[in-house]
Amino acid sequence: MKKSLVTLLLSTPLMCLILSCSNDNMNYMSVDVEEFEAAISDTTVQVLDVRTAEEYMEGHIARSINIDVKTDTFEVGANTRLDKSHTVALYCRSGRRSKKAAEILSNNGFKVIELNEGITSWTNNNKTTIK
């Protein structure tokens, strides 16, 4: 009994730490292609491509602006070029960088949705891009 109580007391803080790091605490919405397309049909939604300038030039979603999340100036650029009173819909190639960007922006007071699996899922669903 005493051993079980000690085990329980020691494991509780670890479980709290693990649960606090789960995706349930995301401050943004990760959406599929259809939801993303519906969101950006609203012209007040700002569309942000967080890939490199080279990737952006290869093809991007209409109305998107490009701010590379891997640069040291991403946060400053986003705060300068984006309006916090309007939702930001963002994407990258596969979803990894956009999740990082979504976290940064949401922590800075932006309302954010991100395209799950990135522009790859967009093009795989036969959606258009522009060069």
Please place each PLM-identified region on the residue numbering.
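Rhodanese-like catalytic fold shared by cysteine-dependent sulfurtransferases
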Residues: 2-6, 19-39, 45, 54-87, ...
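Structural scaffold elements adjacent to functional motifs in cytosolic proteins
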Residues: 47-49
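Short, surface-exposed ligand- or partner-binding patches at beta-edge/loop junctions that are enriched
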Residues: 91
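Bacterial N-terminal signal peptides
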Residues: 9-18
